[in-house]
């Protein structure tokens, strides 16, 4: 029996679990377009999908914000139908042998800062900035970074008066412990600074392959989060960023220096990385690391290693020799229109494949490729949701019992 929602969308197979709900592949039967359908049981103890859909609607029109096509109730479920997206940055990171080149990290950083800035401009903070919640588009939007999952988002100021929420302590740890800011670990109410600090850890994760506080063992989940917090606080930023351009340490130091209700200087942070990008002689061609690799399930570890070495070699040779050796700019770099990258949607003349992997249909979709790079999955869902690997909780700094959020562990 064919299942439909909104009398227009055919429900397909389950492709994962996002925040507070399951996600299915769907089809808009009026035009034959594939969509993502998020379902939440109306009888759930703490319904969130309606709230999340309202936040998505407030965000509509922003670059890198998924389009919401329909919201409503169908039988025993709350439903949100949205634009189908490509793989998450976590999936692509795994596909690239868990190491991104500096060029790819900087291309991503520019767009990710802008996504966070846009959400903040709409009076919300995301509170769960992590690679799983940034997805690439499909087709002509294959170079565009999207931000998803507003299940933990919170309004930080009044939309009319811009009155900031008050400073509070003893708050639950909301989000993902691996990328949580120091102040979040300390139980301080989150604000704009925390989203940006989390992004700094994401960027270093892309550089390093893993963060120093990953893989810590503990008898209980509470003790594990305490160990993550202790390790994070005892690791100086300069040590975390050692061996990488100083801009990454500058970024994190800037974020940690912000006061609770400060408005971050997003332009400064973007320009910090743009100046580094230009000094490295990189080109805004939107050729990411994954565009230079062979897609498919039969790629061996040796092939992946060889491709990564060849990619790094190509990157070194593609740099503009005239740009080498230019000293770092002194003081804060000021935003300049000349230094801004072109829109990711602008077609480029290079021959590399700069879109997300091509859509596949029928029997091809059922093949178990190493990182699910087809249109069916991942879609608006984190790879860690699909595999159940998370360092996430809503853990109160003053509670003995630990109420966990939608991410499980």
Curated annotation (Swiss-Prot):
What is an annotated GO biological process for this record, any one?
signal transduction
Please name the InterPro entries in this protein's record.
CK1_Ser-Thr_kinase, Kinase-like_dom_sf, Prot_kinase_dom, Protein_kinase_ATP_BS, Ser/Thr_kinase_AS
Question: Which segments carry the region annotation Autoinhibitory?
Answer: 317-341
| Localization per Swiss-Prot or TrEMBL | Cytoplasm; Nucleus
Give the EC number(s) listed in the UniProt record: 2.7.11.1
Q: Keywords in UniProt for this one? A: ATP-binding, Cytoplasm, Kinase, Nucleotide-binding, Nucleus, Serine/threonine-protein kinase, Transferase, Wnt signaling pathway
Q: Name one GO molecular function term.
A: protein serine/threonine kinase activity
Pfam families in the record, alphabetically?
Pkinase
Q: How is its activity regulated?
A: Exhibits substrate-dependent heparin activation.
Q: How is it modified after translation?
A: Autophosphorylated on serine and threonine residues.
What reactions does this protein catalyze? Answer: L-seryl-[protein] + ATP = O-phospho-L-seryl-[protein] + ADP + H(+); L-threonyl-[protein] + ATP = O-phospho-L-threonyl-[protein] + ADP + H(+)
- Return the SUPFAM superfamilies for the record: Protein kinase-like (PK-like) (SSF56112)
Listed Polar residues bias regions: 346-358, 380-402
> Would the keyword Ribonucleoprotein turn up in this protein's UniProt record?
no
Binding locations of ATP: 15-23, 38
| Stretches for region Disordered | 300-409
> Primary place of residence?
cytoplasm
What family does the Swiss-Prot or TrEMBL record give for this protein? Belongs to the protein kinase superfamily.
Functional note: Casein kinases are operationally defined by their preferential utilization of acidic proteins such as caseins as substrates. Central component of the circadian clock. May act as a negative regulator of circadian rhythmicity by phosphorylating per1 and per2, which may lead to their degradation. Participates in wnt signaling.
Spell out the PANTHER family in the cross-references: CASEIN KINASE-RELATED
Assembly and partners? Answer: Monomer. Interacts with per1 and per2. Component of the circadian core oscillator.
* Protein name, entry field: Casein kinase I isoform delta-B
* Gene it is expressed from: csnk1db
């Amino acid at each position: 029996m064919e299942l439909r929602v909104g009398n227009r969308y055919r429900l397909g197979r389950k492709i994962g679990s996002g925040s507070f709900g399951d996600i299915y592949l769907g089809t808009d039967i009026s035009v034959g377009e594939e969509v993502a359908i998020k379902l939440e049981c109306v009888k759930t103890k703490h319904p969130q999908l309606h709230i999340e859909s309202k936040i998505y609607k407030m965000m509509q029109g922003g670059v890198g914000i998924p389009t919401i096509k329909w919201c409503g109730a169908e039988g025993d479920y709350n439903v949100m139908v949205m634009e189908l997206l490509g793989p998450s940055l976590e999936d692509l990171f795994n596909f690239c042998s868990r190491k991104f080149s500096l060029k790819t990290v900087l291309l991503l950083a520019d767009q990710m800062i802008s996504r966070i800035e846009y959400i903040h401009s709409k009076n919300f903070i995301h509170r769960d900035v992590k690679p799983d919640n940034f997805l690439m588009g499909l087709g002509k939007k294959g170079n565009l970074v999207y931000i998803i999952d507003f299940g933990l988002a919170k309004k930080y100021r009044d939309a009319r008066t811009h009155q900031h929420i008050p400073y509070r302590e003893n708050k639950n740890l909301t989000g993902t412990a691996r990328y949580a800011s120091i102040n979040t670990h300390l139980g301080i109410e989150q604000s704009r600074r925390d989203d940006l600090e989390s992004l700094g850890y994401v960027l270093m994760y892309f550089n390093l392959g893993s963060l120093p506080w990953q893989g810590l063992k503990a008898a209980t989940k509470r003790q594990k989060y305490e160990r993550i917090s202790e390790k994070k606080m005892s690791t100086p930023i300069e040590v975390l960023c050692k061996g990488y351009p100083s801009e990454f340490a500058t970024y994190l130091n800037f974020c940690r220096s912000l006061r609770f209700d400060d408005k971050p200087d997003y332009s400064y942070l973007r320009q910090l990385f743009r100046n580094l990008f230009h000094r490295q002689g990189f080109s805004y061609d939107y050729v990411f690391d994954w565009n230079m690799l062979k897609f498919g399930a039969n790629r061996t570890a040796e092939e992946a290693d060889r491709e990564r070495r060849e990619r790094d070699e190509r990157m070194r040779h593609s740099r503009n020799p005239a740009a080498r050796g230019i000293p770092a700019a002194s003081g804060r770099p000021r935003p300049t229109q000349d230094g801004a990258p072109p829109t990711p949607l602008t077609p480029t003349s290079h021959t590399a494949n700069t879109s997300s992997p091509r859509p596949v249909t029928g029997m091809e979709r059922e093949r178990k490729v190493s990182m699910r790079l087809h249109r069916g999955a991942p879609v608006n869902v984190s790879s860690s949701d699909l595999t159940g690997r998370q360092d996430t909780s809503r853990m109160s700094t003053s509670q003995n019992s630990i109420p966990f959020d939608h991410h499980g562990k």
